[in-house]
Amino acid sequence: MSVLGEYERHCDSINSDFGSESGGGGDSGPGPSAVPGPRAGGGAAEQEELHYIPIRVLGRGAFGEATLYRRTEDDSLVVWKEVDLTRLSEKERRDALNEIVILALLQHDNIIAYYNHFMDNTTLLIELEYCNGGNLYDKILRQKDKLFEEEMVVWYLFQIVSAVSCIHKAGILHRDIKTLNIFLTKANLIKLGDYGLAKKLNSEYSMAETLVGTPYYMSPELCQGVKYNFKSDIWAVGCVIFELLTLKRTFDATNPLNLCVKIVQGIRAMEVDSSQYSLELIQLVHACLDQDPEQRPAADALLDLPLLRTRRREMEEKVTLLNAPTKRPRSSTVTEAPIAVVTSRTSEVYVWGGGKSTPQKLDVIKSGCSARQVCAGNTHFAVVTVEKELYTWVNMQGGTKLHGQLGHGDKASYRQPKHVEKLQGKAIHQVSCGDDFTVCVTDEGQLYAFGSDYYGCMGVDKVSGPEVLEPMQLNFFLSNPVEQVSCGDNHVVVLTRNKEVYSWGCGEYGRLGLDSEEDYYTPQRVDVPKALIIVAVQCGCDGTFLLTQSGKVLACGLNEFNKLGLNQCMSGIINHEAYHEVPYTTSFTLAKQLSFYKIRTIAPGKTHTAAIDERGRLLTFGCNKCGQLGVGNYKKRLGINLLGGPLGGKQVIRVSCGDEFTIAATDDNHIFAWGNGGNGRLAMTPTERPHGSDICTSWPRPIFGSLHHVPDLSCRGWHTILIVEKVLNSKTIRSNSSGLSIGTVVQSSSPGGGIGGGGGGGGGGGGEEEDSQQESETPDPSGGFRGTMEADRGMEGLISPTEAVGNSCGASSSCPGWLRKELENAEFIPMPDSPAPLSAAFSQSEKDTLPYEELQGLKVASEVPPEPQRAAGAWPPRLDPAVPCVGKALTSAACACSALQVEVDRLQALVLKCLEEQQKLQQENLQMFTQLQKLNKKLEGGQQVGMHSRGTQTAKEEMEMDPKPDLDSESWCLLGTDSCRPSL
């Protein structure tokens, strides 16, 4: 890295939350790069907001807890490691900071990803990747003396060694590798975590000498108290693999002293079963556990062994594939400083229909087990939770026979949501219900199906019998991962990640889009024009829709009542309209009537269809017998209907269609229902008009009482299931706006304001520490959530413009304390009329923040007296390469003049860059001065209001002392006095 790059990195560290932890001394004034971002011209308005919803607490420790959050921007799960800094010692605070620094350096598929960090008052929040499979320690315990297959051990070994190789290449020694710190996803993807004890070594030959780590995994050199290096991590890797092979700790004892003796002497608790595992694998473990560190192989050497080398490419591709669904980019720069908005919500699942008009809340699906997707079938429901688990149960009335569509291994009718245990360890991404079967997709894009195979919907050519009672994987998609699945009553359509469409099952009316009405028992690829990019598939009862990236809609299957939108109305030359009906189509056909809109969501029902365009408008078409089109009447409609009325001006975000009714949710948290209201379909009893034995409504009517946000909604037959959320409270964490280090935060929270250990020095000096004490967040009466400092703090007064320029506040000034501290500690920057003297304004405090090499170069340059007539762009003078070298340089092969010239050019560019930064700071000072003037005017107006208020209060007190005689006691009470209130 160039010296200039190091300088920019140094500036970034000053701007970061923990810059003073690693920065220079506290005596130096704040340089240009140390100006807090949000206070310099309103930078906070440009900060990115990230929204989080807490799910549940994963675990608690001595100094904090780990909490699972859902990030709403991408619907991903993350872990917040919350550390209470007031309860940490100086060393523990350094460890917390160290973990952030180490994680920020590392990017590898087998290493816990670091996304961000925030500071909430005195709590450090580290946002990390979530591993939903627990840790390797628990995985070994769950084996219950049943040894792992060698293939699985090699798979784990490859991932662990790959992670260790990555951190060693970065010059980092982990120092705490153990099964508790090796995490797993449900797809058996390894993630190495917990870098609080990690240490950066300058080279592979560097040595560390601090006694850290877990005793069971300590190397002999650690036990003996001698220096150690990367080979100590290899020893720990050997202990972990030995544990995988034996399900027992490598070294075990009743006390630490005895344990160290056994480690140094190499007395292992037991030996690996050579009849179960290959000699090559056993020798690899023994090599890692060699008593001599020099004899242990490096991580890269382990990867080059034949045991791993022969399968390395295959396993690397597998790691990349498994990591793809959860991988997301980090923030592009450290200085972005995003704002975290944490919103606590209630999340509940309700069902109705089937004779129950009152929405029924499901107590099983709540709080830590909240839902992220729901689906209704004709006979059953399915729910995917935020932790990617699948629950199913029946919704039918009477004694209808089941066919295994619940996936519990039997045909029992479970009336309450039950976890599909057979999918334990699989992260379910999405589920879809057919008439009597279920199909789901995992995060890895693998497809599982269970239930009736009468029409071949299992996709295995009926080799598993007429019914499949447990989830069965479709090997057809092993090499072609699935992105989305949709089920009709008796057919299945999937969209792969390669944007290919496959369909199988019942082919009646051409619903499979295969240009025939044949049934297919295995997935068949659907021919789609190459110019079209399919982004979603949606099955109706007996038809299928494809949605393109440009918002076009393709449809096939039965077009009864024009529910596919394929009918066309044409005007002839004799001024009469011709209506062309398409009864059904066996290949995907463009729905021309929908081409006027860019469709984003489409929801087919039994007799009608609803769609949402890119502007949030709702479109309906199909049968209107029960008013299910929502147009205000029950007349036959031939074309596409754009809904107004109660939905006019609203943006619809969710819609679903049942047999003769429609449910929709809007962005202003309202839920509407219309159509056939019989048997509780609409969750109400409308009285608009009777229709036969049922009660219908043709206008969208609000239901469900108070306002609720609807993340997902599904209707099928006469049933509805939806997720509703309600905001409880919210808080904003402006972590990087304070610019506080760990040490400064802890000091500011101490009662006496004394100096705490470890963290005070750096960028802002003592003035910033005092500032942090005054800027503590205001506690909220409601309890846990607080507002930001700037929002809750009142303005006591404002400095005058003259005082602002002079950078002084007298004792009688109304300048607030926080502003006075900033002005007292700020660097005075002159305001020149021309940019020529800018080179002289390069302050000594700014130089002190530079890296050592630049600082030395600038000091040497400053010893040369400057020429007043020389412009800033002409300094320093260029060396003439034609001038011959003298002395020993004459005998050298290459003259050093060219290298010196490069160094001078680099320093010149560095100085010019600093001058540009100073110009920017001058502009920011002007903006701040303008803002101060505006605030001063507002303050004067506020003072006038205050004087008027005091005058009103005086008049009120006079009235209380001498009430008007023409008012009785009751009317006097209305004026707000206390004379009429009964004593307590």
From Swiss-Prot:
Classification via CDD domains: STKc_Nek9
Keywords of the record: Acetylation, ATP-binding, Cell cycle, Cell division, Coiled coil, Cytoplasm, Kinase, Magnesium, Metal-binding, Mitosis, Nucleotide-binding, Nucleus, Phosphoprotein, Repeat, Serine/threonine-protein kinase, Transferase
Entry note about domains: Dimerizes through its coiled-coil domain.
Membrane-spanning parts: none
Residues found modified as Phosphoserine: S2, S13, S16, S20, S76, S331, S741, S808, S839, S949, S983
Taxonomic source organism: Mus musculus (Mouse)
Catalytic-site annotation from UniProt: D176
GO CC, one annotated term: nucleus
E.C. designation(s): 2.7.11.1
Feature: compositional bias, Basic and acidic residues: 955-967
Keyword Nucleus: yes
Binding site for ATP: L58, G59, R60, G61, A62, F63, G64, E65, A66, K81
Function description: Pleiotropic regulator of mitotic progression, participating in the control of spindle dynamics and chromosome separation. Phosphorylates different histones, myelin basic protein, beta-casein, and BICD2. Phosphorylates histone H3 on serine and threonine residues and beta-casein on serine residues. Important for G1/S transition and S phase progression.
Protein name per Swiss-Prot or TrEMBL: Serine/threonine-protein kinase Nek9
